[in-house]
Amino acid sequence: MSSFTHFNDQGRAKMVDISDKKATVRTAIARSSIVVTKEIYDKISHNEIGKGDVLAVAQIAGIMAAKRTSDIIPMCHPLLLKGVDVSFDWKQSDEQYRLLIEVKVKTEGSTGVEMEALTAASATALTVYDMCKAVDKGMIIGETYLLEKTGGKSGDYTRKS
């Protein structure tokens, strides 16, 4: 495990200087999920949620969150993102409906986009909750995690199952 780089000589927080790092293509894929009732699943599927098209709004929220990550995560560098893709997949078991959220982020720069992907996945799930809470507040946001990252000095990473 490498040492922490976000502390100065006095032990105080600092933003890491990345000016000497080589600009490379960097990608990250993050996942999250939200479990909803059959009623919410049906309303989302038939576009019957009063606030609008849940998946379209959540997708836009995820993209916006990726772009604004450095505004809410203190030590993240502002990045020029080259692409953000938010996708959805439903999984059903018994009366449980799980909306799987996957976010892919890409840049060419001196630092990775893991935090942008994770922030986007989280904001996407939170937006689904916000738009559907009038129907049922018992929704459960699942684990949010990094699935994969490429590029940079630390190399590639793929989450083990």
From Swiss-Prot:
<dbReference type="InterPro" id="IPR047594">
    <property type="entry name" value="MoaC_bact/euk"/>
</dbReference>
<protein>
    <recommendedName>
        <fullName>Cyclic pyranopterin monophosphate synthase</fullName>
        <ecNumber>4.6.1.17</ecNumber>
    </recommendedName>
</protein>
<feature type="binding site">
    <location>
        <begin position="75"/>
        <end position="77"/>
    </location>
    <ligand>
        <name>substrate</name>
    </ligand>
</feature>
<feature type="binding site">
    <location>
        <begin position="115"/>
        <end position="116"/>
    </location>
    <ligand>
        <name>substrate</name>
    </ligand>
</feature>
<dbReference type="GO" id="GO:0061799">
    <property type="term" value="F:cyclic pyranopterin monophosphate synthase activity"/>
</dbReference>
<comment type="similarity">
    <text>Belongs to the MoaC family.</text>
</comment>
<keyword id="KW-0501">Molybdenum cofactor biosynthesis</keyword>
<keyword id="KW-0456">Lyase</keyword>
<dbReference type="GO" id="GO:0006777">
    <property type="term" value="P:Mo-molybdopterin cofactor biosynthetic process"/>
</dbReference>
<feature type="active site">
    <location>
        <position position="130"/>
    </location>
</feature>
<dbReference type="InterPro" id="IPR023045">
    <property type="entry name" value="MoaC"/>
</dbReference>
<dbReference type="InterPro" id="IPR050105">
    <property type="entry name" value="MoCo_biosynth_MoaA/MoaC"/>
</dbReference>
<dbReference type="InterPro" id="IPR036522">
    <property type="entry name" value="MoaC_sf"/>
</dbReference>
<comment type="function">
    <text>Catalyzes the conversion of (8S)-3',8-cyclo-7,8-dihydroguanosine 5'-triphosphate to cyclic pyranopterin monophosphate (cPMP).</text>
</comment>
<dbReference type="InterPro" id="IPR002820">
    <property type="entry name" value="Mopterin_CF_biosynth-C_dom"/>
</dbReference>
<comment type="subunit">
    <text>Homohexamer; trimer of dimers.</text>
</comment>
<dbReference type="Pfam" id="PF01967">
    <property type="entry name" value="MoaC"/>
</dbReference>
<comment type="pathway">
    <text>Cofactor biosynthesis; molybdopterin biosynthesis.</text>
</comment>
